[in-house]
Amino acid sequence: MKFDPMMIDDNTYNMYKGSVYSKMESHVEETNNIFFKLLKHVSNDPVVYEYFKCWISHIVKTPYKKTNVAIILYSMIGGVGKNAITDALCKLFKNYSGHIENIDDITKNFNSHLTNKLFIYGDEINANAKKVSDKLKQVITRPKQNLEKKGIDSIEIDDYSNYIFTTNNENCFKIEEGDRRLLMVKCPDKALEKEDYKAFYNYINDPNNICELYNYFLTYDNSKYEIGVDRVIMTAYKKQLAYENTPAYTEMFYKEPGLYAGQCISSTHLLDMAKDYAKKNYLSSNFTMTTFGTQTKALFTDYVKRNNGTKYDFRNLSTTKFKEHLYKMNKDYYLYINNLESDYIPTFVEKAIEKDDVNPLDA
């Protein structure tokens, strides 16, 4: 027994029987179709909208290839249409869709209800904890999974599942810089009218309409994005979450540059300063000397001295020059942390010392 969307005939019973929808010519016109109108509304960005369509088409065309990308739909309020989209996709992937109510569902034993699926969605999922976040990343891209049933030894099976999660919690997922697995979508904070919902569900409850959608995606040109291979698009929402999860030992330099400019600080003392900063600002202080050292050396390569232990020598940097260095290393983060507009270009000009500002003892 197997679940093989490639449908290779090797005399083994295949639990995958293909789509329930017959192949036919689709007459869907995207511009005035009720499903695509809502998908566009929820995507809230033309680039996200195009990626979303390619993502769906990828599963329809090549169900034997995972997308390796989970889509997270966030809105501050409910009723914007997030779950309506997942309901439609459950119908599109009829017989091969599943639902999780808690993030722990993907890690617990006796998980047969989540096997042999192409599409799985979760409501109000919270994966902000690092342990949960790391496990979720594995699930999104894993090619195999263990099937466990009570009283029966677990067996390894192929995993073709793809995920969408919906949430009203802005910080539901822990995002790290360089993440390749999550498409973070900030939906509009505008609830749909009751009549819009009624019309949408009337549409998707008609199997003929879903069949039309299936065939539309079956022939859709999804070559703009090589789903599962290309790096997932970076949205402003995802960038914001990544910045908010910037380690304390990096944030402290951008927040308080004046404390370090003009100083020569040993790596051990700088680590202690990072731990203190993290605790004072309710950030994670669970980082090792190795992690801290690797990242900080990368940030200040030209200022690392290794005489009698590692030191960071900023004595030739004024606060202005220190800020300028930080800006050059990560312009977007510098603007974010200083609440500056994305198109703002700072000028780093040393403030002239006025005669009256000179300390008479230094004159």
Q: Residues of each region from the PLM?
A:
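P-loop NTPase catalytic core of nucleic-acid-dependent motor ATPases
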Residues: K2-Y121, I125, L183, F217-L218
